[in-house]
């Protein structure tokens, strides 16, 4: 179904609430499902506020090292919602290095990946990982949806890609809570995902 379900389910999959101080880091402003998913998974939240000097991009430097050490999940959104700020490769590198040091999962909300102002499309988490030689994709998980790409928010069609071990656990969790898509929605989704012309129009 749509990426909102997946963004929520990932937190339930990867958060270990028995760990003292389990934390989810989010950009601010943020899509409300990030905080809801964190709280229902039993984690606390920390927020990286937007920096007006950088087109309102999240300022990850506001998160101190002690908080990063407790972090189990980081939500990022590039292009940002509602700011439109895009994360450059250097910012991805810094977050990957933090993830490697502290072991947290990066949930990359890429629903707006095809709505941008510049000439070049923004880097997604997996593209950035590959560009940095991190082709095993350890800890990043990317989310996308047809609702923005194809202007079909009622269709509830999205996908998840990334770290294979995390996705194995994610799919097991989804077995118990997810709902199947109807054949009609599946067929329409395949057609929409397979067509670029309507996205560029």
Identify the role of each PLM range.
Residues 22, 43, 101-105, 136-138:
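A short helix->loop->beta-strand "cap" motif at the edges of active sites that frequently abuts
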Residues 28, 47-51:
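Short beta->alpha connector loops at strand-helix junctions that form conserved
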Residues 50-121:
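Active-site phosphate-binding strand-loop segment of PLP-dependent enzymes
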Residues 3-7, 30-35:
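Conserved coil-to-alpha-helix start sites within the AMP-binding
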Residues 14, 24, 34-38:
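Short hydrophobic alpha-helical segments of the AMP-binding
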Residues 1-23:
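Phosphate-binding glycine-rich loop
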Residues 139-201:
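PLP-dependent aminotransferase class I/II
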Residues 34, 95, 125:
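Aromatic/hydrophobic pocket-lining residues that form π-stacking "cages" and hydrophobic walls in ligand
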């Amino acid at each position: 179904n749509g990426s909102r379900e997946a963004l929520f389910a990932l937190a339930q999959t990867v958060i270990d609430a028995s760990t003292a101080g389990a934390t989810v880091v989010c950009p601010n402003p943020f899509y409300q499902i990030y905080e809801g998913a964190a709280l229902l998974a039993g984690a606390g939240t920390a927020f990286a506020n937007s920096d007006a000097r950088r087109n309102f991009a999240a300022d990850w430097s506001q998160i101190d090292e002690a908080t990063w050490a407790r972090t189990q999940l980081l939500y990022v959104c590039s292009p940002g919602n509602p700011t439109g700020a895009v994360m450059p490769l250097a910012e991805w590198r810094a977050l990957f290095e933090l993830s490697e040091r502290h072991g947290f999962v990066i949930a990359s909300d890429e629903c707006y990946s095809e709505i941008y102002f510049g000439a070049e499309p923004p880097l997604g988490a997996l593209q950035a990982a590959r560009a940095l030689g991190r082709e095993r994709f350890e800890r990043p998980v990317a989310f996308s949806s047809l609702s923005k790409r194809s202007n079909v928010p009622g269709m509830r069609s999205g996908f998840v890609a990334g770290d294979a071990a995390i996705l194995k656990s994610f799919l097991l969790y989804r077995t118990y809570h997810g709902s199947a898509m109807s054949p009609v929605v599946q067929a329409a989704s395949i057609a929409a995902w397979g067509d670029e012309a309507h996205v560029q129009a």
